[in-house]
């Protein structure tokens, strides 16, 4: 059912208690295993209380893609930009909020689907960080059954992989709205153009870039908003200013 995530993990801690979400109602589980409802259906996250949102202001978005393409890193960046965390973790360091399980931190990849709630403007987005390796495909299927839309992550360095196509097929099966997000654009070997060409070859006119990267001296310095035909230059990790669109 839409807007309902059943038995999905939430990567936040409330007084050292693991918080889970069942039928969209926050439930705490203390060390003795006793369940308790959090007051007013709110939970504490980093000292802040997250408000209750009506269903029309809630979106469940699944993050899909091949193993190692950057899904968890993207989710971590979303949490940082929206203020859920004040420090961005790294998969390599085993300190991301979605891969909090000891086994995940040890293996450096996701084993189960994790729910990371973020707030963007007046909408609550339940981001579902799914595993990329086929051994855990059941976790992906469950996330997609609860999702309103999906983001398929593709590495600009590795390009389109088997997991990319599997993710598309899973979305097609459910007629789920989807978009692609290209990662690793700060890598010298990344090629946004090659990714777009390969996706277009596979899926035809369904592929339409909304943004195009700006590179100078082999560095990723900004992007072009294709819809608005406006250039953007990065100033900090999550900030940018308007700039000229390169002639190339």
Where are these regions (language model features)?
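Tryptophan (W) side chains
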Residues: 40-43
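Cysteine-centered motifs
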Residues: 12-14, 21
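P-loop NTPase switch module centered on the Walker A-proximal segment
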Residues: 46-154, 158-160, 209
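P-loop NTPase catalytic nucleotide-binding module
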Residues: 47-69, 88, 155-248
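Residue-identity detector for glycine
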Residues: 28, 33, 46-47
């Amino acid at each position: 059912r839409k807007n309902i995530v059943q038995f999905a993990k939430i990567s936040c801690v409330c007084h050292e208690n693991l918080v889970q979400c069942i039928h969209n109602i926050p439930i705490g589980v203390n060390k003795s295993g006793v369940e308790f409802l959090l007051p007013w259906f709110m939970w504490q996250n980093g000292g802040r209380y997250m408000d209750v949102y009506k269903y029309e202001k809630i979106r469940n978005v699944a993050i899909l893609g091949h193993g190692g393409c950057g899904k968890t890193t993207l989710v971590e960046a979303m949490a940082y930009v929206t203020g859920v965390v004040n420090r961005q973790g790294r998969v390599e360091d085993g300190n991301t909020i979605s891969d909090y399980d000891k086994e995940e931190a040890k293996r450096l990849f996701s084993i189960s689907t994790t729910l990371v709630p973020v707030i963007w403007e007046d909408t609550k987005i339940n981001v579902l960080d799914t595993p990329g390796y086929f051994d855990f495909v059941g976790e992906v299927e469950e996330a997609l059954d609860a999702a309103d839309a999906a983001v398929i992550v593709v590495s600009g360095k590795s390009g389109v992989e088997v997991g990319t196509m599997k993710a598309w097929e899973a979305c097609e099966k459910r007629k789920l709205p989807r978009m692609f997000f290209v990662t690793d654009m700060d890598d010298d070997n990344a090629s946004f153009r090659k990714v777009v060409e390969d996706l277009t070859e596979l899926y035809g006119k369904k592929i339409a870039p909304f943004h195009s990267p700006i590179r100078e001296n082999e560095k990723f310095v900004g992007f072009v908003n294709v819809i608005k035909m406006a250039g953007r230059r990065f100033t900090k990790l999550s900030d940018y200013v308007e700039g000229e669109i390169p002639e190339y």
